[in-house]
């Protein structure tokens, strides 16, 4: 469900940027079209889906680098005193809670690490390639995020990124591009950013469908979800992932998604990390191609940060908590009402 929320958020962002160019097209319609279209590409075959993802990775990194270089090469349009604090500081506890909630909201941006672990069984030489993928991927994502946020601050001061109703500007890339380069080039960047979100859907939908396929293969979901077509695509899993994403797109707002998905991903990742500790204790002799160094210190530190971010969200955003609890409740209903009825022992080779 964390991946489903990520798909809905990315699709909603695509729809938000499309609204900038075509205001008469509702966000939900554009987002739904993107999800269905990308799902159809992956349903055709594995080769087509992989080609879309490979092109998407190259295009996204290239566009971000161009935007960063051109942005810093342009004269700053931010109001004076970019980093000044106009409002009085809240109590230390309140500031810590707000900061933790902000971190939770951005957690899904690093979901690539989770994606690598999800498909670890399909990777050649996982003991080497998974480490390289995670370290290199996290380093690149972190660097790009720092630089792109630097460009945003170069384009506008923080208070200029807030709308009259107190909410942040959703299409921040379009806003920054117009401030730095003018309306015409800003529109061009808006179209390119739309393409970035569209291509990002490809990876999220592929990973999500593979998770469903893997669970069905182990007997944790109905067996029909493990069906592959002639070209190796898990069609039924793709359709289910598409349907769940469409439900979220039409039942929630983009702001609610961005505040909730990161927290949900943080929670589910925390549960997975806790599971690693339990598994190491219960099955110490299990073959592990990839081992955590300095165990159990890294998992404990991670779980501590997870608890802090979860507490921060609960203390600052009641609406987000309600949505998260609703999604978790739905997941439990599906698991105990459907999945467990189809579970079967894993066959040993």
Stretches with model-predicted labels:
Residues 224-235, 269-320:
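C-terminal membrane-solvent junction of multi-pass transporters and transport-like membrane proteins
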Residues 16, 20, 89, 103, ...:
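TM-loop-TM module centered on a large, flexible mid-protein loop between adjacent transmembrane helices
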Residues 259-264, 294-349:
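A generic transmembrane alpha-helix motif of multi-pass inner-membrane proteins
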Residues 11-30, 63, 120-127, 132-140, ...:
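Helix-loop-helix connectors at the membrane interface of multi-pass transporters/channels
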Residues 27-80, 111, 134-138, 261-271, ...:
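Membrane-interface loop-to-helix entry segments
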Residues 58-87, 150-158, 269, 274-286, ...:
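Hydrophobic alpha-helical segments and their helix-loop junctions in multi-pass secondary transporters
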Residues 17, 36-43, 68, 149-151, ...:
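Alpha-helical transmembrane segments of multipass membrane proteins
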Residues 1-43, 48, 189-214, 250-267:
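Hydrophobic transmembrane alpha-helices that form the core helical bundles
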